[in-house]
């Protein structure tokens, strides 16, 4: 498990803001420093899809930044982090990263993470996908990003929506060697 590390969490406007919120909760329990960016679209999605206020979500993070603040600490490669998780990642955010637009703090921080060869995990949320979406995913993967859509697994027999959410975020946290006891891991036994 990583100790005294910093992880950037971004919540974009795609459906599934609960993934980002649950990540923040788990990382807070693990005493891992989080740097949060909530897009304007995500603020609307959080209000529409969850019981959380924006302030409650921000309270889960150690540091919060406005998505328009391109001068924030996380926009510089000299600010050391373990990497970044965008949960959920909209197709707009994916496209911005794939084409190096860096027109918001989310896409700027993602670009920094890629150029510094740190971990960038995109929990992409869209279905069905057209060829442009797939090409953007391929570009980001070529740059070193990891495309990790929150696809449920059923071998652990989920009975609650939180079981499905926890499975997806555990898989993402595995990339950072962060151990949790949220799920039953696959075993042939």
UniProtKB/Swiss-Prot annotation:
Keywords, ordered alphabetically: Flavoprotein, FMN, Prenyltransferase, Transferase
GO molecular-function term, one example from the UniProt record: carboxy-lyase activity
Keyword Iron belongs to the record: no
UniProt superkingdom: Bacteria
InterPro entries found in the cross-reference section: Flavin_trans-like, Flavoprotein, UbiX-like
UniProt catalytic activity: dimethylallyl phosphate + FMNH2 = prenylated FMNH2 + phosphate
Chain sites annotated for binding FMN: 13-15, 39, 90-93, 125
The EC number(s) this enzyme carries: 2.5.1.129
Positions with a binding annotation for dimethylallyl phosphate: 155, 171
Family statement drawn from the similarity comment of this UniProt entry: Belongs to the UbiX/PAD1 family.
Known role: Flavin prenyltransferase that catalyzes the synthesis of the prenylated FMN cofactor (prenyl-FMN) for 4-hydroxy-3-polyprenylbenzoic acid decarboxylase UbiD. The prenyltransferase is metal-independent and links a dimethylallyl moiety from dimethylallyl monophosphate (DMAP) to the flavin N5 and C6 atoms of FMN.
NCBIfam families, per database record: PRK06029.1, ubiX_pad
Protein name per UniProt: Flavin prenyltransferase UbiX
Annotated organism of origin: Rickettsia prowazekii (strain Madrid E)
Lineage of source species: Bacteria, Pseudomonadati, Pseudomonadota, Alphaproteobacteria, Rickettsiales
């Amino acid at each position: 498990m990583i100790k005294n590390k910093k992880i950037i969490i971004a919540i974009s406007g795609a459906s599934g803001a609960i993934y980002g919120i649950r990540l923040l909760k788990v990382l807070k329990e693990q005493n891992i420093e989080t740097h949060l960016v909530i897009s304007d679209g995500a603020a609307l999605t959080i209000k529409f899809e969850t019981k959380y206020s924006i302030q409650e979500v921000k309270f889960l993070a150690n540091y919060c930044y406005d998505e328009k603040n391109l001068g924030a600490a996380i926009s510089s490669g000299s600010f050391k982090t373990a990497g970044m998780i965008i949960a959920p990642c909209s197709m707009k955010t994916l496209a911005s990263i794939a084409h190096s637009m860096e027109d918001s703090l989310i896409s700027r921080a993602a670009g920094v993470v890629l150029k510094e060869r740190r971990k960038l995990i995109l929990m992409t949320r869209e279905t069905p996908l057209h060829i442009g979406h797939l090409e953007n995913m391929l570009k980001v993967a070529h740059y070193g990003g990891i495309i990790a859509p929150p696809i449920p697994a059923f071998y652990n027999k989920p009975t609650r929506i939180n079981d499905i959410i926890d499975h997806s975020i555990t898989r993402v946290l595995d990339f950072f060697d962060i151990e949790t006891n949220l799920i039953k891991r696959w075993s042939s036994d």
